[in-house]
Amino acid sequence: MDLKTTLKVCFIVAIETIFCFTPLGTIPIGPIAATLSMVPVVIASLTFGKGIGMLLGGIFGLYSFIYWTFIMPSFPTAFLFTPFSETAMYKGNIGSLVICFVPRILAGLTPIVVSDMFTMSSNNDNSFKGDVVGSIVGSMTNTVLVLGLILVFFGREYITIVEKNILTVLGITIIKNGIPEAIICAVVCPVVVRALRNI
């Protein structure tokens, strides 16, 4: 990477750090709280490609691991994201690391792949619409995979904690997190990406 690209990537990593460890990473929308942690990951993917996008996704996963291991280890669902939680009822395992890292890394891959495919299939040189679609898919990749892997590795434990059936959990998660975060990514990311490409 040249110096300009390196500085841009460092700036995005700094934003990701702020979003993951401060209240600035959460936007209250009525009773819903949408997180912004996926925004830098999607921006990195669309601006710099698969490699940097997956790197930012890995950093997001690392920050999540650090948060649940050292900052909130006693939270009832901390075991879902770290094998080192202090939750009395349940303990994490290798599945916790899969949940913590794999969805975030793949969420750094899908935006640029989908954007490129959409742009080519529509025979449109304007990549803005492709970036919008890629942003939505990237955000939903994280939401769907995190929830799906939680149900694979800790389905019974998670359902016990939230005291709801699987369909209710899916619906609540998509409505409270998936849709608002996808909308935020679709609105913010393409605009920021276009600006970064022109710098």
Q: What is each PLM-predicted segment?
A:
Residues M1-I199:
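Loop-helix junctions at membrane interfaces
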